[in-house]
C-alpha cells in the first residue's frame, strides 16, 4: 500500500495537478496492456544510464552554502537517517573539522524497523531524540526515507515542530542571509510566515496542500523559500523541490552564524512574531466521505476551542480562521481513508480543545 513513484518536471519540481491528470490518463486500464522489460534486458539494450549524481550535487551545495564555518564550529550533530537514502550525507559533507556527526539508522533498510513510518514527525523521531540526549547533541537532524524532508530536535532532546522550523528557515533567509523574495506556503502551515512577510516586506503566497501546488508557484514567483506542513522545504537557487539535506545544512548555518542553540533561535523568532503552537490529529473513518464532507460544510461553528471564528477558507478542505490569528483545518487525505485535523494558535492551552472541536465538527466525536 505504500509503494509508488514520483514524477518530476524539467525543472526538477513536482508536476502540477493538470500535468498529473495527463499522465494518469495515459496509464493503461489493464495490467496485460502494459509492456514489461526486466532490468537486465533493459541494461543490455542500453536503455539505462548509470551515473554518480553525488559529485555534481556536492559541487552545487558548496555554491549555495559555505560549509567551512559549520565544520569548524565544534558542534555535536546527531543525524537520524531513518534507514533511508540520506544515510551518510551529513558525515560526508561535514567531515574534516571540529564538528562531529553521529548517525543512527544509517543503513538502508526498506522495512524501516523501530518506527511506524520513515517520517520526521512524532513518534518516529523519538529514537533520534533519545540518542541525542544521551550523547549531548547540540541539534538533531532527522531525514525521512528519501531525504526530501527534515525534522529538527533541539539541544535538550525535544522535537521542534515543522511549522516552527519553517518559520526559522524563513527568518534565516530574510534576516541572517539578507535575501529577499516571495514565500510560498501551503494553507496547512504556519501564519508566522505571514507575519515575517509583513516585517520584511515580502509577499506570501498560500497554496493548496502538497508540493504539486508549491513548486509551480515557486517557479512563477521566483520564490525565496517554499514549504509545507510535513517538513519539506525548498529554496531559491536549488530545484523547486524539497531537499532535507540542504534544509539541514541551512539550519546548522543559522546556528553557527547566530551563535545559538535551537531553543535560543526559537526565542529570537518568537520575539518577532509571537509564540505559536501547533498539533494535528489523523483519524481513520469507515463512513461515506461525502457524508462527512457535508457534515463539515453544514456545521458553521461560531467558536472553536473557545475562540471566535472570523472566516472560512474552503480552497482545500475547510479552514476556519480564529480571532487570535490561528486556524483549524479539516481535510481528507488524498490517498487514505483518513481525516486530518490540524490547528495553529497563539494559545498553547487551547490546542487540544481546538482539535477536539474539529472532530466534533466532522461528526467523529
Name the predicted role of every residue range.
Residues 107-110, 145-149, 187-192, 212:
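Acidic, glycine-rich active-site loops and adjacent beta-strand->loop/helix elements
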Residues 138-139, 175, 179-365:
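Phosphate-binding and adjacent anionic-ligand microenvironments
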Residues 15-59, 155-227, 234-235:
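Proline/glycine-rich low-complexity loops and linkers
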Residues 1-10, 143-156:
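Active-site microenvironments of hydrolase-like enzyme catalytic domains
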Residues 3-132, 136:
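Gly/Ser/Thr-enriched, mixed-charge loops and adjacent short helices
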Residues 143-145, 159-164, 239-243:
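Short glycine/threonine-rich catalytic loop with a Thr-x-Gly-x-Asp
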Residues 82-87, 147-148, 189-191, 347:
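Gly/Ser/Thr-rich loops at beta-strand to alpha-helix junctions
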Residues 23, 61-62, 80, 125, ...:
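Buried hydrophobic positions in well-ordered alpha/beta secondary-structure cores of metabolic enzymes
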